[in-house]
A protein has these predicted regions:
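Active-site hotspot residues in diverse enzymes, especially metal/ion-binding acidic/histidine motifs
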Residues: 1-168
């Protein structure tokens, strides 16, 4: 997930998931009528689409857009086959949502910036606030950075399903 996110950032020259989606030819739709849906990714007949709740704020919009872009980059074949919808429908424990969250963390949160804030003594809440992000996304990023060789203390396990718990 890290390499795919870094390649996209380099190719598109931005960490902005909506600009990247546009560069990749992914159509983004907004709907203000979604009650419990934050976002969704679909791929039908070579048409890649992201559907976003139009009421998302400045923290949630980039996060959900990056998460759905993660599904495009990591799970397009599953989305094409329709199996991704079954995973969501039956709330099966699977790795697709966590992988999309990890991708979003790599896309939105720069390793060196996170590392510098942690070295300055910022806690997870302060890092999330400083980077205009969500605490769980920062926790996922810290875990992934440890796997990349950074030596960071992750105080608690992130809730990989945190996007599902948000209500607009």
């Amino acid at each position: 997930t890290y390499c795919k996110a870094m390649n996209l950032i380099q190719m598109c020259g931005t960490r902005d998931a909506l600009r990247i989606a546009d560069d990749l030819g992914i159509t983004v739709f907004y709907n203000n009528n979604y009650k419990n849906l934050l976002g969704m990714y679909m791929c039908r007949q070579r048409h890649r689409m992201i559907f976003l709740n139009g009421r998302l704020d400045e923290i949630w919009l980039p996060l959900v857009a990056a998460h759905e872009l993660g599904h495009d980059m990591l799970h397009r074949d599953i989305a094409r086959s329709g199996l991704m919808q079954e995973f969501i429908l039956f709330h099966m424990k699977n790795t697709t949502e966590y992988e999309a969250n990890a991708f979003a963390s790599h896309l939105l949160l720069d390793n060196e910036e996170v590392y510098e804030l942690a070295r300055e003594g910022y806690d997870v809440v302060q890092i999330a606030q400083a980077m205009n992000s969500h605490i769980n996304l920062v926790l996922i990023k810290l875990q992934k950075m440890n796997k990349l060789g950074y030596d960071l203390r992750v105080p608690v396990e992130p809730d990989g399903r945190f996007l599902r718990k948000i209500r607009q």
